[in-house]
């Protein structure tokens, strides 16, 4: 793995764990299939991003991260505004941070 992208790898791996566990917890607490499905899908996207970053394919890894973060941020941002509940706010903030980090690195790759 490139040392340059190790922080992005860690961030995407952490987001994968957070959203996947959140989906499982949401299902366990309230039998929410949408939480389980969304947690699984976004967990898979962030895991895919982390995998590609660990293999040195930074363009694909960062691209998948930007995609996942944009989608999750949009969905959770809308939900955070509507409900003011802490979980959507945390997920929207985390995805925004991941989007900024991965987007900046992806921009730098394409700029050079």
UniProtKB/Swiss-Prot annotation:
Gene Ontology BP annotations: regulation of heme biosynthetic process
Predominant location: membrane
Chain ranges passing through the membrane: 9-26, 36-53, 60-77, 87-109
UniProt xrefs under InterPro entries: TMEM14 (IPR005349), TMEM14_sf (IPR044890)
Any single GO CC term annotated in Swiss-Prot or TrEMBL for this entry: mitochondrial membrane
Keywords: Membrane, Transmembrane, Transmembrane helix
Membrane topology, record value: Multi-pass membrane protein
Subcellular location as annotated: Membrane
Pfam families: Tmemb_14
Recorded family membership: Belongs to the TMEM14 family.
PANTHER family on file: TRANSMEMBRANE PROTEIN 14 HOMOLOG, TRANSMEMBRANE PROTEIN 14, 15
Name the UniProt record assigns to this protein: Transmembrane protein 14 homolog
Protein's organism: Dictyostelium discoideum
